[in-house]
């Protein structure tokens, strides 16, 4: 009798199985398509396919004035819109050589930290949902709603605020709003404790996240990781402390780091970062209630005049008209400005040719560097761990595809 195994041609032998994960998968966090090669249930290879949300943002910015370019940045990482505007404004201000007044800096820092809470709340709670916990997102979204109302009261919009402008912020915050943000902080810390009690020591959650997607510090740096991905692996690298911008150097906060660089450590770092952000917000609120002053530079060639001035002064009217039609001219040169966005180092490389529009605006999205390591992080893990690793990377496709 002939042995069937001998008769089988090489092509008929057992092949690895290929499946598509996404782009409509609920755990894909947007329009990610992963082509997975599986050996049984073990992941052999991960191939991310991106570009499904590509809108040509960098090219569109080249045809807009510096002021018109600001709203494009809200639409990159749409979980924390103002943090992106911040990097662009810092880059433009470096080229213009202008200083933002202290009150403007405090408002920017306050809203950047609100953005960090918005982003981390979304990530931590949906990450818990990806591995099977259904309660956290319901709690998290309730808090995000309160924070979005603070966005709305400052700028008129819940998400795409366009509130940070080159030179400062669009307008001052009403005292009642600052007081309400202060009143939000302590109950929010109580909610974080509840969330901690529900998820952090949960046996099933730990089984799904401990020793999954481990990345050593050397690997993290070699892949170009930043933000939580580096801090989770044990490096206390935070641009707010390492290269302070605005008034971060005057504020008191700690930088949490992980030990093992796995999904669980990254989750714990994000939880602690929310506490530190709340600490920063309290300090900003305290100073905003004490100190008055302008919220943007007084140079009317860059920042539009107040409405009252326009009714009295012809010159103010001319400034307003010129700013909103032609825009301001930025001296020729190139500059790189980066902020510690919730996802990592968000950088803008801005090249000016001396006109009213950017010659080139290169956006450095942190999620792009993190997503490229999916193959490295998932290889050898089970299929179910892919969504855990992806959730711990905290990826948003607005910024990855741009």
From Swiss-Prot:
Keyword annotations of the record: Cell inner membrane, Cell membrane, Membrane, NAD, Quinone, Translocase, Transport, Ubiquinone
Location (main, coarse): membrane
Domain of life: Bacteria
InterPro entries the record matches: NADH_Q_OxRdtase_suD, NADH_UbQ_OxRdtase_49kDa_CS, NDH1_su_D/H, NiFe-Hase_large
Reactions it catalyzes: a quinone + NADH + 5 H(+)(in) = a quinol + NAD(+) + 4 H(+)(out)
Keyword GTP-binding carried by entry: no
GO cellular component, one term: plasma membrane
The protein's Enzyme Commission number: 7.1.1.-
Subcellular location: Cell inner membrane
Gene Ontology MF terms in the entry: NAD binding; NADH:ubiquinone reductase (non-electrogenic) activity; quinone binding
Gene3D superfamilies: Cytochrome-c3 Hydrogenase, chain B
Pfam family for this entry, one: Complex1_49kDa
Record keyword Protein biosynthesis present: no
Membrane topology of the entry: Peripheral membrane protein
PANTHER family given in the database record: NADH DEHYDROGENASE [UBIQUINONE] IRON-SULFUR PROTEIN 2, MITOCHONDRIAL, NADH-UBIQUINONE OXIDOREDUCTASE 49 KDA SUBUNIT
Subunit-level organization: NDH-1 is composed of 14 different subunits. Subunits NuoB, C, D, E, F, and G constitute the peripheral sector of the complex.
UniProt family annotation: Belongs to the complex I 49 kDa subunit family.
Biological role stated in the UniProt entry: NDH-1 shuttles electrons from NADH, via FMN and iron-sulfur (Fe-S) centers, to quinones in the respiratory chain. The immediate electron acceptor for the enzyme in this species is believed to be ubiquinone. Couples the redox reaction to proton translocation (for every two electrons transferred, four hydrogen ions are translocated across the cytoplasmic membrane), and thus conserves the redox energy in a proton gradient.
Name of the molecule in the record: NADH-quinone oxidoreductase subunit D
């Amino acid at each position: 009798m002939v042995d069937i195994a001998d008769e089988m041609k090489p092509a008929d032998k057992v092949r690895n199985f290929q499946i598509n994960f996404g782009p409509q998968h609920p755990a894909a966090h947007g329009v990610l398509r992963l082509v997975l090669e599986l050996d049984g249930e073990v992941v052999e290879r991960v191939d991310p396919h991106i570009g499904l949300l590509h809108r040509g943002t960098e090219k569109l910015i080249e045809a807009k004035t510096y002021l018109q370019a600001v709203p494009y940045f809200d639409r990159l990482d749409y979980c924390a819109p103002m943090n992106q505007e911040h990097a662009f404004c810092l880059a433009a201000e470096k080229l213009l050589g202008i200083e933002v007044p202290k009150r403007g800096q405090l408002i920017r820092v306050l809203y950047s930290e609100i953005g960090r809470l918005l982003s981390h709340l979304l990530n931590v709670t949906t990450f818990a949902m990806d591995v099977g916990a259904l309660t956290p997102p319901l709690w998290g979204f309730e808090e995000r709603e309160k924070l979005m109302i603070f966005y709305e009261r400052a700028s008129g919009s819940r998400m795409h605020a366009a509130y940070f402008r080159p030179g400062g912020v669009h307008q001052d915050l009403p005292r009642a709003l600052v007081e309400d943000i202060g009143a939000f902080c302590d109950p929010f810390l109580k909610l974080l404790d509840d969330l901690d009690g529900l998820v952090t020591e949960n046996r099933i959650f730990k089984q799904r996240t401990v020793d999954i997607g481990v990345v050593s510090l050397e690997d993290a740096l070699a892949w170009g990781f930043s933000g939580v991905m580096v801090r989770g692996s044990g490096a206390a690298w935070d641009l707010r402390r390492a290269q302070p911008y605005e008034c971060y150097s005057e504020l008191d906060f700690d930088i949490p780091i992980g030990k093992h660089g796995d999904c669980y450590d990254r989750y714990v770092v994000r939880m602690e970062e929310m506490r530190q952000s709340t600490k920063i917000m309290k300090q900003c609120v305290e100073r905003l209630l004490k100190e008055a002053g302008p919220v943007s530079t007084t140079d009317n060639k860059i920042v539009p005049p107040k409405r009252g001035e326009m009714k009295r002064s012809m010159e103010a009217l001319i400034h307003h008209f010129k700013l909103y039609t032609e825009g301001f001219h930025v001296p020729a040169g190139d500059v790189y400005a980066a902020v510690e966005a919730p996802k990592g180092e968000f950088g803008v490389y801005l090249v000016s040719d001396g006109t009213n529009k950017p010659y080139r605006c290169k956006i450095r999205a942190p999620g792009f560097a993190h997503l490229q390591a999916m193959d490295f992080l998932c290889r050898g893990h089970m299929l179910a761990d892919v969504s855990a690793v992806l959730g711990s990377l905290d990826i948003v496709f607005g910024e990855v595809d741009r």
